[in-house]
Amino acid sequence: METTTLHPVVMKLNFPFITRKPSFCGRTLIEGHNTELLHRYVLAMALELKANAADLADCEVQAIRLGGGSASIINGSDLDHLLRLIRSCYHVAEDAPVTMRTCPADINGANMPFYNRSHLTRYDLELYSLEPLDFCTLDTLNYSEQMPYITHGFLRADRRDSMGFVLLYGKKTVSRWGFRHSVLEVTCRPVCHVLLQRCAGADMLDDAAAQAQLDEAAQLLTEAGFVQYLPRRWAKPGCEDKFWQGAANGMDVLAFGLSAYTRLDGMITTNTSDLNTYLAHSADYEQITVSTVPVQTAE
């Protein structure tokens, strides 16, 4: 009896929502404080996943990324539902990591049971800055007092590689010393992965100043034992992100959700960015697809 070789892919679930204003990422994101809307979005994504499962039966998922915005804004039970659905409808490698871009406030007693049941392996905390004077411009909360509970109580990051940080660089109102302080704070904590996100919009520093911050971060992170495995992405040895590595090395990407980009069999397919269209027709490939072009054309 012949054994069918499965096609290795990585998977992304796109959650283009933010938990705060403003956003510094330069993409169009939706302020996600409407619980009913977020639940409808999850149901729509579930329909899209089910509708495409049969056509992707020859694929094996090597890594899953929950991103595109603050994915943790979705209710923990809804995320658990989606991941259970994926594992029941798709071939998922036994050791496939599941990583999530996370607002620190969502690491709490209400969500963690669902996150643990979903087998999330790393939480990329959107801290943006660890300099106390910058919290007023970068966030609505100062998480300093909560970090011990997040780090040791919920994530147990000191005993497992479960915590990453997202830091913002290249912002006008954050001094070079403030950014340096943030990076040094990272090196003192049980962090296994760092994503450096450049500030976008009116507060963006010029290219030279932003690059100077990036260069300084590279030096500090290298001295602390981190390895740069992709632009602006750093990890402790062995903790490199399999989703980003796979995508960067040309592995096909299955993506679901609003504005998602799927790369498969030499083609890139783009989902609609219209929320109402997606909510109403997520299971209909033709209704939610806005473009299908060869990879070379898209690049």
Residue ranges of each PLM-predicted region?
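Local cysteine-cluster metal-coordination motifs and their immediate loop/turn environment
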Residues: 16-29
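Long, contiguous juxta-domain segments that are non-catalytic but functionally important
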Residues: 1-3
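C-terminal scaffold of the Radical SAM
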Residues: 6-10, 27-54, 59-299
